[in-house]
Amino acid sequence: MEFLKNNPKWIRQPKQVQINEDKVVILTERGTDLWARTYYGFQNDNAPVFQVETTDKYFSFIVKTEFESTCRFDQCGVAMYLNSDNWFKASIEYENEKIQRLGSVVTNHGYSDWATTDISSDIKSMWYRFSRRDSDYCIECSEDGINFRQMRIFHMWEGAEKITYGIYACSPTEGFI
C-alpha cells in the first residue's frame, strides 16, 4: 500500500490497531466521532485519523475500505484533518440492517456540512478517490475500484498550503472496544 510508505502518523491512535504492508485494521472505540456544531449543537473531535502530510497542490489518493459495522453510526472512510475546526471526512455510516449512509462532511471554521445518500447495508466495502486542486477538493466513490462517481466538490478555507489526509474509523455509540 503506497500510503503506508509515506510515513503516516496518528491523530488520536486507537487502542487496538493492526498494520501490515497492505492494510490497516482499526477496532473502533465507543464514543469516537468527528462532528462540529451544525444542526445538532454539539462538537465531537476524538476519532482516530491515520494520515500523511503533503504540500502537493495536485494529487489523487485512492483507497479501499472494508468494514464490519454493527452499531448505529459506525463509520469507516477517508479524512483530511487539519485541526478541530477545519477537516473533511467521507465514509459509509451504518444506520440499521437495511440502510447505511454514504456521505461526506466538510467542516470549515468550526461548522460541519453533511451530505448523504442512502445505500444498502449489504455493502461492506467502498473505494474512495480524494483529489486536490489547490484549496479545492473532490471526493468520489466506487464499489469496484474502477468506475468512480462524484460525491462532492468542495473548498477548504484553511486547505491551501500543507495538508494532512488519510483514513479514519469511529463509533459514536457502542464500538468494538
Question: At which residue positions do the language-model features occur?
Answer:
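Extracellular glycan-recognition regions
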Residues: 1-177
